Amino acid sequence: MTPMKRSVQTQVSEPFMESWGEESLPELPAEQSLTEYSDLEEAPSAHTLYVGHLNPQFSVPVLACLLRDTLERLEMPVAREHIEVVRRPRKAYALVQVTVHRDTLASLPWRLQTALEEHLILKELAARGKDLLLSEAQGPFSHREEKEEEEEDSGLSPGPSPGSGVPLPTWPTHTLPDRPQAQQLQSCQGRPSGVCSDSAIVHQQIVGKDQLFQGAFLGSETRNMEFKRGSGEYLSLAFKHHVRRYVCAFLNSEGGSLLVGVEDSGLVQGIRCSHRDEDRARLLVDSILQGFKPQIFPDAYTLTFIPVISTSETSVPLKVIRLTVHTPKAQSQPQLYQTDQGEVFLRRDGSIQGPLSASAIQEWCRQRWLVELGKLEEKMKALMMEKEQLQQQLQQHGPVSCTCCVL
């Protein structure tokens, strides 16, 4: 009985399993299924990244420029139109549309850590005292931003809210130590300063140097500050004439600065200035100022080239040329400087007067001598008052009698 029952059960179960497998689990060709899955893994997909804790001190174009450069260093090139920056008084964040593999998103933490250690400009992108927050956005951001604002008001550190996005793998803040200054400057050691400066401009690594952001506001023109846009062939055509006019005018007044690459409204734009252009500008300024009379010494002026961080990529670095004339030292007699071409210029409020005629130069000398004469008269009055006070003190004490005794 037992063998018969076992055989019957086996005969019944086998057709049942065969029929169930055929109906519910249709077999697919192995090669086709593997190919489809491999294609899905290799094809990049579109994602929206949420970048938080941006520095609200920068403007929207500057934040977009720095964020674009940051993503390029992380091997995630993004077009400018795919970056949307939202800036508020106390915070700023961005939404970035990227098309990358899932593995690339997973490797963002260690690549961002490496970039932070090598590029100081990335640290300036984050708000003070905070680290950049990267997460994949999958939902609306209104609730997320409201929650982050509430947490900031309550003193809690903001983070990704549940359900609003799938955060990328995070890393502890103590794994990002501050890079020593000696290690930061190590890459620039052993090279000429000009070469180091140009390479720093190309890679947006400005170490130990001033820098300006395109679109920044520097203020308005004053008696001691003059702005020039410097577009086109400015360096080869108009720059030498402006050097003569403004340096001579600043020397004959209280000093000042000429900034080339800044609009009259005070907005920084920068001009295309390569390393060769820097050398030509230095030689031009030195050759012109050597012909001034009275003679000008090198410590009387300073010529610097300030890098400009731009939102657009250019083959030639953008810079602002700053020619500063220091306040002339007080002289025993008034001095009137003239250019290498024998012209004299004066600085008025917001304008340049000159070249002066002979009568204008005589009038200037007369006014200067009147000023010096007034100063001498004031000194004479002060000395006369001091003399009178000393005489009064002597008269109050009276004569002093002395008695001698001879033993």
Curated annotation (Swiss-Prot):
User: What highest taxon heads this organism's lineage?
Assistant: Eukaryota
Q: Which residues cross the membrane?
A: none
- What are the disulphide bonds in this sequence? none
Q: Which residues form a coiled coil?
A: 366-398
Under Pfam families, the record lists: SLFN_AlbA_2
Q: Which residues bind ATP?
A: 261-268
- Ranges of Polar residues compositional bias? 181-190
Q: Where is this region: Disordered?
A: 1-28, 137-191
- Which regions are flagged for Low complexity bias? 155-167
Q: Which GO terms describe its molecular function?
A: ATP binding
Q: Gene3D superfamilies from the xrefs?
A: Schlafen, AAA domain (3.30.950.30)
Q: Which UniProt keywords apply?
A: ATP-binding, Coiled coil, Nucleotide-binding
Q: Which InterPro entries match?
A: Schlafen (IPR029684), Schlafen_AlbA_2_dom (IPR007421), Schlafen_AlbA_2_dom_sf (IPR038461)
What is the name listed in the Swiss-Prot or TrEMBL entry for this protein? Schlafen-like protein 1
UniProt source species: Homo sapiens
Taxonomic lineage is: Eukaryota, Metazoa, Chordata, Craniata, Vertebrata
